[in-house]
Amino acid sequence: LTKGIVKRGVTELVTPGVATSDKLLENKTNNFLAVLHLSDPLCGIAFLDITTGEFYAAEGNVEYMDKLMQSFQPSEVILSKSQVKRFKEQFDTKVYTFQLDEWVFREQYAYDLLLQHFQTQSLKGYGVEDLRSAIVACGVAIHYLKDTEHANLQHINSLQRITATDFLWMDRFTIRNLELVHSSYEQGTNPVSYTHLRAHETRED
């Protein structure tokens, strides 16, 4: 028998946006965590898939944020506690949400976290240096992963800026009827993921 106090390691905390199940890997299905920073005049958003390491950032108005949410279909959205009411009023979604304290959304804190994570002196090489609200969202994403005890983040080694021309925009009705992201049937074939949609880009000569 062991005498004294037995120290036990802290395990990773699993929430919908940071789940890394084998089923997701087998189906090549993205599981995006989203961080939304509702600010004026421009909001910022980050999408991060801890399984694949994909990390995206964007900035724009609420309508643009809503369109991106429809396209990426995140399984969890991180918000500051003060923005929950506004989120419910402006976004028509039942996605799982988690709230963090206001101080986590400080711009300098988020910026420093990203510099530390990417081991760089600036974010110019990632094309997001001028996206102040998006930088906040990205920094909060890294904070959340660390806060939920996800220590192995070396595979998250790039950050891609999203522009409005990157997507073919469709409304919720079209997406639902075409079953582009989630099947309307609980049983049956696997849904077509955002990854699969991106793999078939239309090129213009």
Predicted region positions:
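Charged catalytic and DNA/RNA-contacting regions of genome-maintenance
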Residues: L1-R198, R203-D205
